[in-house]
From Swiss-Prot:
Similarity annotation: Belongs to the bile acid:sodium symporter (BASS) (TC 2.A.28) family.
One GO CC term on file: apical plasma membrane
Protein name: Ileal sodium/bile acid cotransporter
Organism, as annotated: Cricetulus griseus
PANTHER family xref list: ILEAL SODIUM_BILE ACID COTRANSPORTER, SODIUM-BILE ACID COTRANSPORTER
Length: 348
């Protein structure tokens, strides 16, 4: 018998004689170390983002949750429906369609909070949307998957990792709450922390993508259709989220916030669900899709950020946004404008 055709017993994903992700000791150690480091860094970044959240505004979004409702409709209405349409349109395999839908049903990721800061978004709305979408995902993910996946698979076979969702919620709420307290007690120190954290957050987003590429570099053999869907999906999320928020009468800075919350998904949660729910043979077909989505959602978010910065430099202050903020918000200057001296309310 030809031993070369035997799958490596240490492989993590195998199909017959195909081993697409043999796990070396280096990969195993790197995975544990980087997961630990990234988790700690993410908690610190979310703490710094909390330093830009004001309690009375955060509670105001919960009492008058129009922005949160729009975000909810985008997160658990637009994204699953878009995933379903793309899956049918491209005629992908049932197991691949299910993974696309799992990605679309995931709540927003913490990267959206970091990007919302950089595009002068509503940080209070961003954090409240991420918190609410993660909490609501406990019920909405099973419901959306039941509705959209039953033409391909029994939704009961999909394992929802409620412990991971709970961990994500705790990892978001606790650091942000501490940051809010620091902002309340020591606003000057909070400004410094926010500046450092916003830069660290931008670096962290890139670092997560690079680490993912290193850890799963041998799993990049995947059907071209999934590459195309992974490219279109985040663009659709950003565009449709922005459009729906604008149709709902939200001001421009909140439209940017909702767009980011819609397009930037929790890809780590999707990867966890995929690994818990599928056999090694099926994983061979879909394992890399969450990472593909993650790369393109970050890439397009960076493009949008660059376009926004260029627009600000070319056009200066936006009088339309100033009028909208005066008419619709009637809120005092937030800590974001105070922190970034040159930014005025009309730019938010």
């Amino acid at each position: 018998m030809d031993n070369s055709s035997i799958c490596n017993p240490n492989a993590t994903i195998c199909e017959g004689d195909s081993c697409i992700a043999p796990e070396s000791n280096f990969n195993a150690i790197l995975s544990v170390v980087m997961s630990t480091v990234l988790t700690i860094l993410l908690a610190l970044v979310m703490f710094s983002m909390g330093c830009n959240v004001e309690l009375h505004k955060f509670l105001g979004h919960l009492r008058r949750p129009w922005g949160i409702v729009v975000g909810f409709l985008c997160q658990f209405g637009i994204m699953p429906l878009t995933g379903f349409v793309l899956s049918v349109a491209f005629g992908i395999l049932p197991v691949q369609a299910v993974v696309v839908l799992i990605q679309g049903c995931c709540p927003g990721g913490t990267a959206s909070n970091i990007l919302a800061y950089w595009v002068d978004g509503d940080m209070d709305l961003s954090v409240s949307m991420t918190t609410c979408s993660t909490l609501l995902a406990l019920g909405m993910m099973p419901l959306c998957l039941f509705i959209y996946t039953k033409m391909w698979v029994d939704s009961g076979t999909i394992v929802i990792p409620y412990d991971s969702i709970g961990t994500s919620l705790v990892a978001l709420v606790i650091p942000v709450s501490i940051g809010m307290y620091v902002n309340h007690k020591w606003p000057q120190k909070a400004k410094i922390i926010l500046k450092i954290g916003s830069i660290a957050g931008a670096i962290l987003i890139v670092l997560i993508a690079v680490v993912g590429g290193i850890l799963y570099q041998s799993a990049w053999t995947i059907e071209p259709k999934l590459w195309i869907i992974g490219t279109i999906y985040p663009i659709a999320g950003y565009g449709l989220g922005f459009f729906l928020a604008r149709i709902a009468g939200q001001p421009w800075y909140r439209c940017r916030t909702v767009a980011l919350e819609t397009g930037l998904q929790n890809t780590q949660l999707c990867s966890t669900i995929v690994q818990l729910s599928f056999s090694p043979e099926d994983l061979n077909l879909v394992f890399t899709f969450p990472l593909i989505y993650s790369i393109f959602q970050i890439a397009f978010a960076a493009i949008l950020l660059g376009a926004y910065v260029a627009y600000k430099k070319c056009h200066g202050k936006n009088n339309t946004e100033l009028q909208e903020k005066t008419d619709n918000e009637m809120e005092p200057r937030s800590s974001f404008q105070e922190t970034n001296k040159g930014f005025q309310p009309d730019e938010k």
